[in-house]
Swiss-Prot record:
Protein name per its UniProtKB record: Forkhead box protein J3
Organism from which the protein derives: Mus musculus
Biased composition (Low complexity): 263-274, 317-346, 405-415
An annotated GO cellular component: nucleus
Tree of life domain: Eukaryota
GO biological process: cell differentiation; male meiosis I; spermatogenesis
Lineage of origin: Eukaryota, Metazoa, Chordata, Craniata, Vertebrata
Region (Disordered): 143-178, 248-275, 316-451
Disruption phenotype: Null mice have an abnormal skeletal muscle fiber type ratio in males as well as defects in muscle regeneration following injury. Male germ-cell-specific conditional knockout results in complete male infertility, early loss of spermatogonia and meiotic arrest in spermatocytes. Spermatocytes show significantly reduced expression meiotic arrest-related genes.
Keyword Repeat carried by entry: no
InterPro entries for the chain: Fork_head_dom (IPR001766), FOXJ2/3-like (IPR045912), TF_fork_head_CS_1 (IPR018122), TF_fork_head_CS_2 (IPR030456), WH-like_DNA-bd_sf (IPR036388), WH_DNA-bd_sf (IPR036390)
Subcellular location: Nucleus
DNA-binding region: 78-173
Length: 623
């Protein structure tokens, strides 16, 4: 009994504590704060404390009236009633239980002399209470009751107060027409759709700074779309010349090295050849595609082009596409005062017999593109500054018996997979940076310079467009790869190793290319030119000329100062052509750069530079 008696207080205290805590946190009482509950509470208060105190809350009782005794008590001073109570007293004193605003004013002044001399401020308060208080209802006059102003009455059944609700936010449109950071693809000329069975589609996502490539034939899971971890660097993106929409450019692979900022094109640079082929008439679009693994896309394209030929020769078993992603950026280069045409290469089955290796149009042309792999760049810096004077010769490039260090028209092999970060198309030293070059598989000619030698490039978007156009017209089924067994074996080894080639392996690959081109006569070795020299000072070239051998077109670049040297690793493009007027300087100090393009598709003429250097190269010896 004693224990029970002692336990009772503790149990009671615990219950009280729990009730107190729940009352502090519970919100059940909030919806009960309505006008009706307040009126009922006022009635209880009136019954408990008498009529005198409840008069201040007369507003809460629609039937409250004012006694004459109370009027006499507060006749001399300010009455202790709220404005709502005064309105209630006035309306309830009327036999019709309604009054106009002027009648309410008059009743208050008659019963409480204080308001006669209090000014007009209290009248504003009366109007506010009438319009804001839910207990008062505005009653319009009937037609048979002429007069001014509406009546005010007491609402005996006011609407229940509802809990205030937060206003709904307007739903944001999921897709906005344009964002502050979106770039009009039409103005940039970045859209490209490549037609053709095996031609890839390139896409540049300018918002995310990503470059993408995919095979148009592949769809769904077939086309690699994994995210590209290494997007374009800010420097490379900023260097892209977005204003040069109207000119054609050649591709250059981009290694991670700095270079002068791109400059806007001059009107002379914006001249663009007319493409009369039906393949070229299609609009270039690639903003719709957002495929982001460039490395895997190249491997897929490489397989689609060479798998059949290599499988027949027993040279290659293609492994599954590796998800490893290489740092690739898309870039294209623009010559300052001349249109740089991309250098495709002839896909005829027999190279020795057909030396039109650089036919840019027709069904056999290919855009030159190169993969830039971070593994292959010895220099970690994104860009090496461009050297204004003679660049050091690179020992890593023994594979080039370059006939002219100045001949830098790049020959691309049939494998777009060739990872040469070192194959560089000519870079204008004081011109734009070049972001990386994609490479749809070019036909079987490629001379790669310098293994592991990094250099700096940047370019403009138009070069990418032009390469897309050229790649779209290639008929890959006609390419004869039987004479490139050694090259294909090297490519197969590179593909098996996920293109992680060291410098020695890359040098071997380049050397085998060089040996093949030398044996076939495409490269005429010269004793006066060091083999490890891949580029030299560039000099004015002859005006562009049409070449009759295999619908080639020669596009000359404008002269550069002798002190300005092109970036290291710029590959040769010696052309085997027996054409008058085609000039290339054989000496180390000067060169006439010529770009071969089909004459039928590119009817272009350029004025002859005043300081043109005559060519002393024996073209007959090559043919």
């Amino acid at each position: 009994m004693g224990l029970y008696g002692q336990a009772c207080p503790s149990v009671t205290s615990l219950r009280m504590t729990s009730e107190l805590e729940s009352s502090l946190t519970s919100m059940d009482w909030l919806p009960q704060l309505t006008m009706r509950a307040a009126i009922q509470k006022s009635d209880a208060t009136q019954n408990a404390h008498g009529t005198g105190i409840s008069k201040k809350n007369a507003l809460l009782d629609p039937n409250t009236t004012l006694d004459q005794e109370e009027v006499q008590q507060h006749k001399d001073g300010k009455p202790p009633y709220s404005y709502a109570s005064l309105i209630t007293f006035a309306i309830n004193s009327s036999p019709k239980k309604k009054m106009t605003l002027s009648e309410i004013y008059q009743w208050i002044c008659d019963n409480f002399p204080y308001y006669r001399e209090a000014g007009s401020g209290w009248k504003n308060s009366i109007r506010h209470n009438l319009s804001l208080n839910k207990c008062f209802l505005k009653v319009p006059r009937s037609k048979d009751d002429p007069g001014k102003g509406s009546y005010w009455a007491i609402d005996t059944n006011p609407k229940e107060d509802t809990l205030p609700t937060r206003p709904k936010k307007r739903a944001r449109s999921v897709e906005r027409a344009s964002t502050p950071y979106s770039i009009d693809s039409d103005s940039l000329g970045m859209e490209c759709i490549i037609s053709g069975s095996a031609s890839p589609t390139l896409a540049i996502n300018t918002v995310t700074n990503k470059v993408t490539l995919y095979n148009a034939d592949q769809d769904g899971s077939d086309s690699p779309r994994s995210s590209l971890n290494n997007s374009l660097s800010d420097q490379s993106l900023a260097s892209v010349n977005l204003n040069s929409v109207g000119s054609v450019h050649s591709y250059t692979p981009v290694t991670n090295h700095p270079e002068p900022v791109s400059q806007p094109l001059t009107p002379q640079q914006q001249q663009q050849p007319q493409y009369n082929l039906p393949e070229r008439e299609k609009q270039l679009l690639f903003t719709e595609y957002n495929f982001e693994d460039l490395s895997a896309s190249f491997r897929s394209l490489y397989k689609s082009v060479f798998e059949q030929s290599l499988s027949q020769q027993g040279l290659m078993s293609i492994p599954s596409e590796s998800s490893q992603q290489s740092h690739t950026s898309c870039s294209y280069q623009h010559s300052p005062s001349s249109t740089v045409t991309s250098h495709p290469h002839s896909n005829q089955s027999s190279l020795p017999n057909n030396h039109s290796g650089l036919s840019a149009t027709g069904s056999n042309s290919v855009a030159q593109v190169s993969l830039s792999h971070p593994q292959m760049h010895p220099q970690p810096s994104p860009h090496t500054p461009h050297r204004p004077h003679g660049l050091p010769q690179h020992p890593q490039r023994p594979q080039h018996p370059a006939p002219h260090p100045q001949q830098h028209s790049q020959l691309q092999p049939p494998h777009s997979q060739h990872p040469p970060p070192h194959q560089h198309i000519q870079h204008h030293p004081n011109h734009q940076h070049q972001t990386l070059a994609h490479q749809p598989p070019p036909p079987p000619q490629q001379v790669s310079c310098n293994s592991g030698v990094s250099s700096d490039w940047y370019a403009t978007l138009d070069m990418l467009k032009e390469s897309c156009r050229i790649a779209s017209s290639v008929n890959w089924s006609d390419v004869d790869l039987s004479q490139f067994q050694g090259l294909m074996e090297s490519m197969r080894q590179a593909d098996l190793k996920n293109w992680s080639l060291d410098q020695v392996q890359f040098a071997d690959l380049c050397s085998s290319l060089n040996q093949f081109f030398t044996q076939t006569g495409l490269i005429h070795s010269q004793s006066n030119v060091p083999q490890n020299v891949c580029h030299g000072a560039m000099h004015p070239a002859k005006p562009s000329q049409h070449i009759g051998a295999g619908n080639l077109y020669i596009d000359s670049r404008q002269s550069l100062p002798p002190s300005v040297m092109p970036p290291p690793g710029y590959p040769h493009i010696p052309q085997a052509l027996n054409t008058p007027g085609t000039t290339m300087a054989g000496h180390h100090g000067a060169m006439n750069q010529q770009h071969m393009m089909p004459s039928q598709a590119f009817p272009m003429r350029r004025p002859l530079p005043p300081d043109d250097i005559q060519d002393d190269f024996d073209w007959d010896s090559i043919v």
